Amino acid sequence: MLTGGTENYPSTQALSTHLEDLYGMSFGTNLATKGIGQVLNISSVCINETFLPYQENLLVQQIKMFNDVLFHPNVRNGKFDEQTFAIKKKELKERLIVQNDDKFMYGLDQLFKNMGEGGFLSISNNGYVEELDRITNEEVYKYLVECLENDVKHLYVVGDVDESIVDVFKENLIVTQYMDIHLK
């Protein structure tokens, strides 16, 4: 849902066009199950500003994109844009069906289901089509808000950067009071 649009860029196409205007900046999300927890990975890659023909602060633009996606998604009346929600739900359902048709993935799911019978290990990290049908738009948005308010957050900055970059994040990223920032 996070890559489906924001208030400022209300569709996937508008978001993609904006990223393209920022020298092809990439932005993506994925979700993984680790033990009994979920890890939401949000990543973005942009060109090093030293390679631009003129001075433009892409890092601040990148941070603003994080703010838009996390804190200003395309939401009205406590739920995501209906059309975007329907599209994303359909895409996920199709991925789940394809994974169930993949013999290796199906076998792996069955292995964990039998090994961890009655425990967390038996729960598919991909989810279930039957459960997806019951999930509502409002529930997904409510869960996002709960995660933003309550979950542990870490930010990793990788690249040709110095420690002063932490100040740029603190000045421009809303969530920094709840976040550990790591430089690599």
Locations of regions flagged by a protein language model:
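Active/ligand-binding-proximal structured segments within catalytic/core domains
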Residues: 1-19
